[in-house]
Amino acid sequence: MGRKVTVAVSTLNQWALDFEGNMVRILQSILEAKDMGASYRTGPELEVCGYSCEDHFREPDTFLHSWEVLLEVMMSPMCENMLVDVGMPVMHRNVAYNCRVAFFNRQILLIRPKMAMCDDGNYRESRWFTAWTKALQTEEYVLPRMIAQHTGQQTVPFGDAVIATRDTCLGYEICEELWNVRSKHIEMSLAGVELIVNSSGSYMELRKAHITSDLIRNASFKAGGAYLFSNLRGCDGQRVYFNGCSAIALNGEILARSQQFALQDVEVTLATIDLEEIRAYRVSLRSRCTAAASAAEYPRIHCDFEMSTHSDIFKTSTPPLNWPMHTPEEEIALGPACWLWDYLRRSGQGGFFLPLSGGVDSSSSATIVHSMCRQIVQAVQQGDAQVLHDIRQLLADSDYTPDNAAGLCNRLLVTCYMGSVNSSKETRRRAAQLANQLGSYHIEISIDSAVNALLSIFNAVTGLTPRFRTQGGCARQNLALQNMQSRIRMVLAYIFAQLTLWVRNRPGGLLVLGSANVDESLRGYLTKYDCSSADINPIGGISKMDLRRFLTYAKDKFNLPVLESIIDAPPTAELEPLQENGELQQTDEADMGMTYAELSQFGRLRKQSFCGPYSMFCHLVATWKSDLSPKEVAEKVKHFFLCYAINRHKMTVLTPSVHAESYSPDDNRFDHRPFLYRPNWSWQFKAIDDEAEKLQPIYTPSSAQLRPSSEDLLISTQRSSHLDDSKHSSPLSSASASASIDVGISTAAVPLPGAAAPGGLSKKPSGYSKVHVNVLGKIKDRTGIPV
């Protein structure tokens, strides 16, 4: 009997309900694993039908076609003399389960259902599947007749069991079970299971890849053994990007791993493991041996198969490797680009159309497309036949072979500067320079004639002509004129997206790309149905601060020097008239009444730390104590929640974007909230004001901690007593917390600091009046609600 086994984990780019394509990729992974000498192959979660079938999991067809694919795979000669398992949905006694189906030589050994559902973040598994709760138990599963006719089996074990070969034993966890507080791998390892297999559907979030590697290491470190982790990769039809990182670990060290980001549809990762290393490691852990001696016994399904052979002794065991992690800037460059590629090739469209303003956001979207082109060229040069086939099909050119990113970008990306009389020469110049350096097909248009045409219609009906604020108009007129420009750009974007390839004598149309970042979506700083309304958005899950860092990285990595001037330029929508000298008088942060750094912090506290208005104030009054007084913090928090509430409706029509940030306000699934709020948050804001009133007398900005004097404490106590006397009366009856929305943002006459330079806290004594007139005036007109 041998002592070394070669095992394979598969990273697959599957597509929901693409049963034919999914089967081909599964068979390809099995063939590659077998050719490389593996005796066992596993794959990702629900690889047969695709993970993101969602409510299609309620359709009998999905189960039927999954069994049909399993039959084709199981009967394939590729699988002979190899232990294989695949992921698919299985209905058992009228309950749907997410399962692994293990088979050997055309015989099903075990159907192992998932025992812990994931309902966090973008996951909603309990909507479609039920967790198997009968620990260490199996039941008889009656096979479909079409399967029984080929295998000769009528029933197979279904439940929580492990598979014992002649030389070792393997057991299963499925995705969430690794993250679960009661992970099954500990129980299995104590029961003598040496190879623990996890099929997963884990998606990308910035700065989170290390969590998976840490969990895999720890799973094999605590009680010894080999851990085989197989994950999906790519966009299979939803907003997430499954981020690969399949890996094999042994006794706390990573032996092999797949790429996190790649265009490969199939990547097989192997490791050769010495089983005696597992046994020696485990027996050396005395506390583990004590626990194992009294561990419950797992049901074992016996398989008459040796995963190792005597000749395997000549094989070299796979040594440990270092797992370097991508920086967040690299993750932005690679992840959304791969997601765009999957979406583009599976949508049947001919490329992208991007309104390019010359600012950070649209420049980031354009740079991500350029990164996609670089990856395509690299994959083709490395001999990836599937990528070459796909790009030729997209471009309707069977002889084309991309040899440089700029040339490919010229075919795939159309950028358009949509200027107006309010646009500056600087943004026009930056957009043109970036397009030239990227290689995109660039056009410039003016929207002024369209604006004038719409205004003439309005004037013909009403006899009135709205004016900008700088021209004597009110805030309502000013906002209407800005929104009209934005919406005209959206209409023009779709016209050019549909017809540009016709102009270029190519078939098909273009996907419109959006460029609204996660912070502006959270704040609602975008016009509903403007250029933020697109087919897809590569940066919708990324913060402004991260985009700036990404462009700094891309400037050198992709040789795009113009990005430096784009990063340094103040963010602006350019929707209001320029000053007489041609310079800007409108900036985003002044319009919003908060900096992007503050907005990012608000977003993380709201989503990641589950803070409502009062909890957020309590957190920030300590975090910002060296810069802002309690009352100033209170005004900022209230301003954010007011803006969030009255703009929440915009999230219901937000353009689909790749999920990347853990505080995303994506309404589709990740962030479920009402879209009709009471915008003045009367009860919550009164709680903030009361607390700020207590803290203000003892506030010392230069202190590391609040150190109230005896006199301050006495005054604070007296004030608290006064407030306590009235605490039983409804705060709605007080002047500072009126039920009427007319109370505005503030319930205390404290100036709100204005905007500072990007990336810092804002603190200007005269800022509140500017925010109140400029920002709240726009909010009032945008929603029709007086605030």
Curated annotation (Swiss-Prot):
Residues 5-275 form the CN hydrolase domain. Residues 325-787 are annotated as: Ligase. Coiled coil: none annotated. One of its GO terms (biological process) is negative regulation of neuromuscular synaptic transmission. Pfam families: CN_hydrolase, NAD_synthase. It catalyses: deamido-NAD(+) + L-glutamine + ATP + H2O = L-glutamate + AMP + diphosphate + NAD(+) + H(+). It is an enzyme of class 6 (ligase). The modification Phosphoserine is found at residue 703. Its EC number is 6.3.5.1. The active site is at residues 45, 114, 175, 357. GO terms for cellular component: cytoplasm. ATP binds at residues 355-362. CDD domains: GAT_Gln-NAD-synth, NAD_synthase. The keyword Plastid does not apply. InterPro entries: C-N_Hydrolase, C-N_Hydrolase_sf, Gln-dep_NAD_synthase, NAD/GMP_synthase, NAD_synthase, Rossmann-like_a/b/a_fold. In the C-terminal section; belongs to the NAD synthetase family. Catalyzes the ATP-dependent amidation of deamido-NAD to form NAD. Uses L-glutamine as a nitrogen source. Because of its role in energy metabolism, involved in the modulation of aged-related cardiac function, mobility, and lifespan. This is Glutamine-dependent NAD(+) synthetase. The lineage of its organism: Eukaryota, Metazoa, Ecdysozoa, Arthropoda, Hexapoda.
